[in-house]
């Protein structure tokens, strides 16, 4: 699904994967919907966590 991306994503990667704007990407990573890692001012997201969140969103919308 995200084979061309590293195992740890930054906000720009999340933005590209989901096809959303920068503001939306930052709102999402600050929403608490999934675990993020803060390294100084940098925000990192595990690719596997994002995939699980996406799959959960797909399952929730299917119901």
Language-model features, listed with the residues they occupy:
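Polyanion-binding surface elements
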Residues: 1-24
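Glycine-rich loops and low-complexity Gly/Arg-rich segments
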Residues: 2, 33, 61-63
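Alpha-helix boundary recognition
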Residues: 3, 29-30, 55
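Intrinsic disorder/low-complexity detector
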Residues: 9-15, 37-40, 61-63
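Major-groove DNA-recognition helix of helix-turn-helix-type DNA-binding domains
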Residues: 16-44
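Short, well-ordered alpha-helical scaffold segment located
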Residues: 24, 49-50
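A short, Lys/Arg-enriched interface patch at domain edges and termini
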Residues: 50-63
